[in-house]
Amino acid sequence: MMAATVVSRIRTGTRWAPVLWLLLSLVAVAAAVAAEQQVPLVLWSSDRDLWAPVADTHEGHITSDMQLSTYLDPALELGPRNVLLFLQDKLSIEDFTAYGGVFGNKQDSAFSNLENALDLAPSSLVLPAVDWYAISTLTTYLQEKLGASPLHVDLATLKELKLNASLPALLLIRLPYTASSGLMAPREVLTGNDEVIGQVLSTLESEDVPYTAALTAVRPSRVARDVAMVAGGLGRQLLQTQVASPAIHPPVSYNDTAPRILFWAQNFSVAYKDEWKDLTSLTFGVENLNLTGSFWNDSFAMLSLTYEPLFGATVTFKFILASRFYPVSARYWFTMERLEIHSNGSVAHFNVSQVTGPSIYSFHCEYVSSLSKKGSLLVTNVPSLWQMTLHNFQIQAFNVTGEQFSYASDCAGFFSPGIWMGLLTTLFMLFIFTYGLHMILSLKTMDRFDDRKGPTITLTQIV
């Protein structure tokens, strides 16, 4: 990580442990923050006292663009006018942890030249997590502050340049990074980048040119785990397998001059003669999905999905919807008239009239299926060889704006099994309470042996 480079400045064993533990805690915290939005930044200069110790590198802190400008302004105004920007394609603080030799294996470090530069630099600053937006505008910011255009250089062109301490210069050195196990391993690439940094700095030092250098990346090379990793403890997470989040595919969109019909389902499965096929991956997120036959107008719409081959034939699914005005509610309502499955010249019809709602809304239902155990919203008048199940089904064919669904009218009725259970339980408890209250109010004093008109009962005490 970024902080691992600072560790190299501490040579004695007595000072190693506390600093190492502090920096490793920064690694754990930065790994828990959304790393796809932050990259590390290392700054060092040949001038002294350009940066005060950073007080904001506490747990979870991310350096914003405004904070970064407060760190850079003193160096650009008071420091050397020659600025080097080592810009890597990908870099994360985890790279410094994995390949920086922070556990004492200094001979295996892939950042030996960078660590040596930080050791010898009179001024340095390490920011483990900088906001991606701040880094994306860093080159433009440096250009405005220095008043010099960025010059892309390599080792060959750098040796030919004659830098002047009084004239501003912004030198941009691009460093590659390969995170895959392709032609080169990440350690080899990082080591090669570190050698480039060492050669560039050696060239400047040989010419006795003062400079300020920065190392950062365009984007992170790794994606950190969830923030819950810190709250739950790192120890238990080390051997656990990270569960991949399910991919969210975009809805099917039928367009003529604008998006007209939107259709989405988390799972789209069809069966013919009890042989099931999952059409989800063939339907959503597919650029060349066959929508031939689809059409739309203000009162009628049809979404036609054609697959070939499917069950050994060309199969077309047609979702037919209509929008009508109802005077009672004084608004337009849409209804899915039917669902048709065309195959080998035959047509299977399903009645889907329960798929309905105001035309300004979309329709959503957890299950739209021909199976009885999943609601049977797809109803056929005659026995059919076809079955269909749509999980988390959503459709909108009228008043579509852009590629997003409107507010959804859900199929869940008010008197669901859970609601019935709650109502019956409440009524039963209310009956018990009413009966108990009635019994309490019906209590009477025991006056059976108390005759107020008769003689007084006298009890003689016998000793």
UniProtKB/Swiss-Prot annotation:
Keyword field contains Glycoprotein: yes
Tissue: Expressed in brain (at protein level).
Keyword Lyase in record: no
Membrane-topology descriptor: Single-pass type I membrane protein
GO term, biological process aspect, one: regulation of cellular pH
An example Gene Ontology CC term for this record: endosome membrane
Sequence ranges on the Lumenal membrane side: 33-412
Molecular-function GO terms, alphabetical: ATPase activator activity; small GTPase binding; transporter activator activity
Transmembrane segments: 413-433
Propiece residues: 33-225
UniProt modification remark: N-glycosylated.
Subcellular location: Endoplasmic reticulum membrane; Endoplasmic reticulum-Golgi intermediate compartment membrane; Cytoplasmic vesicle, Secretory vesicle, Synaptic vesicle membrane; Cytoplasmic vesicle, Clathrin-coated vesicle membrane
Residues annotated as signal peptide: 1-32
Cytoplasmic side: 434-463
Residue numbers marked as site, Cleavage: 225-226
Family the entry assigns: Belongs to the vacuolar ATPase subunit S1 family.
Subunit structure of this chain's protein: Accessory component of the multisubunit proton-transporting vacuolar (V)-ATPase protein pump. Interacts (via N-terminus) with ATP6AP2 (via N-terminus). Interacts with RNASEK. Interacts with TMEM106B (via C-terminus).
Functional note: Accessory subunit of the proton-transporting vacuolar (V)-ATPase protein pump, which is required for luminal acidification of secretory vesicles. Guides the V-type ATPase into specialized subcellular compartments, such as neuroendocrine regulated secretory vesicles or the ruffled border of the osteoclast, thereby regulating its activity. Involved in membrane trafficking and Ca(2+)-dependent membrane fusion. May play a role in the assembly of the V-type ATPase complex.
Protein name: V-type proton ATPase subunit S1
Organism, scientific name: Rattus norvegicus
Gene expressing this chain: Atp6ap1
